[in-house]
Regions:
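Conserved beta-strand-loop-alpha-helix hinge in the C-terminal portion
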Residues: 158-193
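Conserved small/polar residues in nucleotide/adenosyl-binding loops
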Residues: 196-197
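Hydrophobic/aromatic position at a conserved helix-loop-beta junction
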Residues: 102-104, 134
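Conserved catalytic loops of ABC-family nucleotide-binding domains
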Residues: 129-141
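Conserved H-loop
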Residues: 132, 145-151
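Hydrophobic anchor residue at the start of the ABC signature
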Residues: 97-98, 126
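Catalytic Walker B motif of ABC-type/P-loop ATPase nucleotide-binding domains
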Residues: 109-113, 118
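ABC-family P-loop ATPase nucleotide-binding domains
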Residues: 8-93, 104
Length: 197
């Protein structure tokens, strides 16, 4: 917050600048370590390096919500339970990763590119499952597939910047407006062309 001499961010100062609302409440909870986040990572191919064993062992180890059997059925994973993670295709790993995330008990579920590696039928199944979750929990999805984004999200932030340098989140807008702004390559409220970034 402009205090360049200080090497650490003081959360209370950041929170104080925000208007009362959901973001302020969330950051307060995060600051107080009362928020638990479940993350589906972007790079599912790293999962077999981090966890040795089979699909059933992984999923049962994260079954905090007691939904193991229901999720196995929803994701069509029954035939994969005895298979080692390093033997799975990209799409199978993606489904296992999303299932594992949903089995965790969390306040916020974060899905980084949940549609990659999946065919259109699997993408739509994942969309329905994530939408169902969003009725009872906070859900954040990072997605580059505009068709999936159009179906899965109510509100969308466009994020732009330079890798390793800076990133800016636009204010939330309806998904349709966000997609149109992205396709047009121009953000009216920032008077910014996305083409040159």
């Amino acid at each position: 917050l402009g205090e360049f001499e200080s090497s650490e961010c003081i959360w209370e100062d950041v929170i104080e600048t925000l208007p009362r609302g959901e973001l302020r409440d969330f950051l307060s909870e995060l600051n107080e370590s009362t928020v638990k986040v479940a993350l589906k990572p972007q790079y599912v191919d790293h999962i077999p390096k981090a966890f040795k064993g089979n699909v059933g062992k992984l999923l049962s180890s994260v079954n905090e919500r007691g939904l193991y059997d229901e999720m196995i059925k929803k994701f069509g994973l029954g035939h994969l339970l005895e298979r080692n993670l390093d033997q799975l295709s990209g799409g199978e790993l993606q489904r296992v990763a999303i299932c594992a995330t949903l089995l965790k008990k969390a306040d916020v579920y974060f899905f980084d590119e949940p549609s990659s590696y999946l065919d259109i039928y699997e993408r739509m199944r994942i969309v329905r499952i994530i939408q169902e979750l969003s009725e009872s929990a906070r859900v954040i999805v990072i997605e580059h597939d505009l068709a999936v984004l159009d179906v899965i999200a109510d509100l969308t932030h466009i994020v732009y910047g330079k890798k390793g340098a800076f990133g800016i989140f636009t204010p939330a807008r309806t998904t349709r407006k966000a997609i149109n702004a992205y396709i047009e390559g121009y953000l009216v409220e920032q008077n910014l062309s996305l083409i040159h970034i």
